[in-house]
Amino acid sequence: MQQDKVNLLGLNQKAIEDFFISIGEKKFHARQVFKWIHKKGVIDFDAMTDLGKNLRHKLKEKAQITIPKVVFSKASKDGTHKWLIDVGGSAVETVFILAEGRGTLCVSSQVGCTLNCSFCSTGKQGFNRNLSAAEVIAQLWIAARTLSKTDGEHDFTVTNIVMMGMGEPLMNFENVVPAMDIMMDDLAYGLSRRKVTLSTSGVVPRIYDLLEQSGVSLAVSLHAPNDMLRNEIVPINKKYNIDELLEACKLYAQKGPHKHITFEYTLIEEVNDNLSDAEELVALLKSREVPAKINLIPFNPYPGTPYKKPSNNRIHRFKEFLQHNGFVTTVRKTRGDDIDAACGQLAGDVMDKTNRKQRYLKKLGDTNAN
């Protein structure tokens, strides 16, 4: 039966080797298939020309390589690309962002999100389910195969991965870690740990697990300089407070691929963008002795939000204060906002929880009609 076949797409190198041993085949054949899938983009066993006929026949009986369907894709004038990907009747978004010298793919880990951060549009649609490892790595497979390498002006090679799309990746640890293993495998995409970044809102126990089992680069969605405000806008803080979070971050900085943690801080007008907030943030990070780089993200408004984007003057003032106090600070440029691909807009084409499937099916029907 089709449903009994193993989808090889989501198996990291060890898992695919174990599968081949279980069907009486050698590990080196597993590595051949692994390379065909991820390095060469081939998903037809018959096209894997260095495999024997009998092995290809056995694989067709016992395994499959299933790639989710791309419902539609969009390209922004600034080179940003976005895909809406079918994951079994629901949909997730993947975004490719061009910047000087690199191409970053923003990968989703869940359909929706459980954390319900007050300023994030993804959380407003509710939570459906975790993505499988195959559905996570498929986003990179699709991007690597469908992006043109160059348009004469831009290089569309994926050089960096950020697990910053829809969902909280550490709430889907068991599937995200094997997918990241594939991203970093030299027989697959060959990205270094420094080029794969996982962003978390602060699932503290899993930060320790991540350091032990993967050790990719870590970014933390902080967004507030104290527990009172963070409890309000990042509710997981009620379970794992700032002290616990920064303790985990300090250890990760000591042992991870970078000697600092990137803290993401979404600037929301008159909520967390006051000079007093900047002062408190500086005092917090210095007192905890966490090596930090700060990435300021101007809030991206979406329909129904009560929040506003700060003025450029307020953003500049906040940044200047942090820099004056010794912190490397960047302001994230808004990219892809004309196709709802900017940070915080990843629910634009994916629907609220109650209407998700109906609207998805309508989108699918409209796409097929075209």
From Swiss-Prot:
User: Any binding details for the cofactor?
Assistant: Binds 1 [4Fe-4S] cluster. The cluster is coordinated with 3 cysteines and an exchangeable S-adenosyl-L-methionine.
Identify the residues that bind [4Fe-4S] cluster. Answer: 113, 117, 120
Q: Which residues does the entry assign to the active site, renumbered to this chain?
A: 93 (proton acceptor), 343 (s-methylcysteine intermediate)
Q: Where in the cell is it found?
A: Cytoplasm
Q: What is its EC number?
A: 2.1.1.192
A Gene Ontology biological process in which this protein takes part is: rRNA base methylation
SUPFAM superfamilies found in the cross-reference section: Radical SAM enzymes
Q: Which CDD domains match?
A: Radical_SAM
**Entry GO terms, CC:** cytoplasm
Q: Which UniProt keywords apply?
A: 4Fe-4S, Cytoplasm, Disulfide bond, Iron, Iron-sulfur, Metal-binding, Methyltransferase, rRNA processing, S-adenosyl-L-methionine, Transferase, tRNA processing
| Miscellaneous | Reaction proceeds by a ping-pong mechanism involving intermediate methylation of a conserved cysteine residue.
Name of this protein: Dual-specificity RNA methyltransferase RlmN
Protein's organism: Francisella tularensis subsp. tularensis (strain SCHU S4 / Schu 4)
Write the lineage as a comma-separated list: Bacteria, Pseudomonadati, Pseudomonadota, Gammaproteobacteria, Thiotrichales
